[in-house]
UniProtKB/Swiss-Prot annotation:
It comes from Aggregatibacter actinomycetemcomitans. This is Bis(5'-nucleosyl)-tetraphosphatase, symmetrical. It is an enzyme of class 3 (hydrolase). InterPro entries: ApaH, Calcineurin-like_PHP_ApaH, Metallo-depent_PP-like. Hydrolyzes diadenosine 5',5'''-P1,P4-tetraphosphate to yield ADP. The keyword Hydrolase applies. NCBIfam families: apaH, PRK00166.1. Keywords: Hydrolase.
Length: 275
């Protein structure tokens, strides 16, 4: 009985299957947590979606920026990006079922028994765990039950870029989405930066990785995230686990067994031609 956490799949189905086979993942006993971005630029996004969905309660994923973009294209709000390889999903007989399943996934998972929080991108430097859970839940409630099309139509903006407990309505939801699914760097005053996707050592000195800012949660809790492939091989604080190691870029897919903190990696079978 083991708990596994795995980085962004991006449609890298073969590597995903190889890792599951290597650890002898048993959905009757084990649990798999995924950092989101199940789809988009790899060769087999449809198979990734179907497999994670088929695992039922044995697999738990968080929503990520590419997942949300896919939902927006399914609604006709956004166009499919040239590098996204999702045509097979749109042609699938279970297309609507997959879209509805995906939009009902959480943005944050807290596992108090095993003392970790899972998000795609990060947690705001101005949030404690309670605020993070509340803000994630507010977005989830709209995507699952409310007028989610209205939110999807209006979630693409870079303002507000700083937290205030007085944020309301779309501004509050948009900030939460940006933090949980897009954030990498922040300015020292905690404003979000959306432009820099570099490694820490190559970033402008005015910016800091979100987890390097002053927030007690970053020191006391275990946070698992994906999203930031350029962090590969860089050192993060011991309780901050970045699992996106750029498989779709031709690097590797990474899985972590939580109980003993053992890592398993699978080199990319091939680099996606979507880049």
């Amino acid at each position: 009985m083991a708990t596994y956490l795995i980085g962004d799949l991006h449609g890298c189905y073969d590597e995903f299957q190889m890792l599951l086979e290597r650890v002898r993942f048993d959905p009757a006993q084990d649990t798999l947590y995924l950092t989101g971005d199940l789809l988009a630029r790899g060769d087999n996004s449809l198979a990734c979606l179907r497999l994670v969905k088929s695992l039922g309660n044995a697999a738990r994923t968080v929503l990520a920026n590419h997942d949300l973009h896919f939902i927006s294209t399914a609604l006709g709000v956004k166009k499919i990006k040239p590098r996204d390889r999702v045509d097979a999903i749109f042609a699938a007989e279970d297309f609507f079922e997959l879209v509805n399943w995906l939009r009902c996934q959480p943005l944050l998972i807290h596992n108090p028994a095993q003392n970790f929080v899972l998000v795609h991108a990060g947690i705001s430097p101005d949030w404690d765990l309670t605020a993070a859970k509340v803000c994630a839940n507010e977005v989830e409630n709209v995507l699952r039950h409310g007028n989610y099309r209205y939110l999807v139509e209006n979630m693409y903006a870079e303002q507000p870029d700083r937290w205030s407990p007085h944020l309301q309505g779309l501004d509050r939801l948009r900030y939460s989405i940006n933090v949980l699914t897009r954030m990498r760097f922040c300015y020292l005053d905690h404003r979000l930066d959306f432009a820099c996707k570099l490694s820490i050592k190559d970033a402008p000195k005015a910016l800091a990785p979100w987890f390097a800012l002053d927030n007690p949660l970053y020191q006391t809790g275990n946070i698992v995230f994906g999203h930031w492939a350029s962090l590969v091989d860089e050192t993060t604080p011991p309780n901050i686990y970045g699992l996106d190691t750029g498989c779709v870029w031709g690097n590797r897919l990474t899985m972590l067994r939580w109980e003993d903190k053992q890592y398993f990696t699978q080199s990319a079978v091939k680099k996606s031609n979507a880049f």
